[in-house]
Amino acid sequence: MLIDQFDRKINYLRISVTQRCNFRCLYCMPKIPFDYQPKENLLSFEELFLFVKATIDEGIEKIRITGGEPLLRKDLSIFIKMISDYKSDIDLAITTNGFLLKDFAKDLKNAGLKRLNISLDTLDHKKAKTLAQKDVLDSVLSGIDEALNLDLKVKLNTVALKNLNDDELISLLEFAKSKKAQIRFIEFMENTHAYGKLQGLKRDEIIQILSQKYQIQLIKKDEKAPVSIYKADDYEFGIIDPHSHEFCDSCNRIRLSAEGLLIPCLYFDEASSIKEAVRKGDIKAAVEILQEVLRNKPEKNKWSVVDNETSSRAFYQTGG
């Protein structure tokens, strides 16, 4: 079992398999980065799996594959199959922008994937092109339909932004309901790589907008994640509210970057590399590095909205 210095059980591993993305979303990576790691600096899927297997043995129960855009990484379905074959009942999911999903959904399902989180910030073609700086909406919607047709469980993620999609929150909720998918509205998390003029909606503002049409009722607050579950009449949706709901006391996650950096907290600059240990085949040493990272995992993040601090680490490097 993995326990940090504050007696928190760590059972959730988020793996960023690539920094690259085919969108240039205003809230994440509006400009082409100059800090992409060359391919040789990235851990191969075989190397990643050696470490992942060890973390499962140590108590990891949930794995989320992220990016960048994970579907840009060649042979991702092979990596999914490695994990699924090793532990078929592990909670294994991918977060994707959905653009390539129509082409890859079947392979992912056959590899053992059961769940997807898909970004959907707007149903308007013009706004989608503004947000992603690319004409993406038709491909994303096709990807969502393909995943649902294959009986993959789908959650839709919407970053709620003032003057961009705040007039669509009800429409997005109703779209998700029509697809029998759960939507989760996300408070914008400030970071130094985002477009500087963006302003996000807070939880209460999201609820206020949805309340214009629906009776909103809080039904569940997950203490191990910054998500609260609500009902709009008979439909359940989520709000991921890091501004409004501090969950550090029960944080259960650790992050691994594509180049082998173990990151204890999204808003914490320190990180430790397992690359050398893994490439030497010394998985015991890699696990010891993981345990040391957990001993140094902070009690709380260093994000202070009052002081207008932002994350200096790019979310496309850590998967958000």
UniProtKB/Swiss-Prot annotation:
Residues 5-225 form the Radical SAM core domain. Keywords: 4Fe-4S, GTP-binding, Iron, Iron-sulfur, Lyase, Metal-binding, Molybdenum cofactor biosynthesis, Nucleotide-binding, S-adenosyl-L-methionine. [4Fe-4S] cluster 2 binds at residues 248, 251, 265. GTP binds at residues 14, 64, 95, 155, 253-255. GO terms for molecular function: 4 iron, 4 sulfur cluster binding; cyclic pyranopterin monophosphate synthase activity; GTP 3',8'-cyclase activity; GTP binding; metal ion binding; S-adenosyl-L-methionine binding. Pfam families: Fer4_12 (PF13353), Mob_synth_C (PF06463), Radical_SAM (PF04055). The keyword Nucleotide-binding applies. PROSITE patterns: MOAA_NIFB_PQQE (PS01305), RADICAL_SAM (PS51918). S-adenosyl-L-methionine binds at residues 27, 68, 119, 189. It comes from the Bacteria. It catalyses: GTP + AH2 + S-adenosyl-L-methionine = (8S)-3',8-cyclo-7,8-dihydroguanosine 5'-triphosphate + 5'-deoxyadenosine + L-methionine + A + H(+). Catalyzes the cyclization of GTP to (8S)-3',8-cyclo-7,8-dihydroguanosine 5'-triphosphate. HAMAP family: MoaA_B. PANTHER family: MOLYBDENUM COFACTOR BIOSYNTHESIS PROTEIN 1, MOLYBDOPTERIN COFACTOR SYNTHESIS PROTEIN A. Monomer and homodimer. Belongs to the radical SAM superfamily. MoaA family. This is GTP 3',8-cyclase. It comes from Campylobacter jejuni subsp. doylei (strain ATCC BAA-1458 / RM4099 / 269.97).
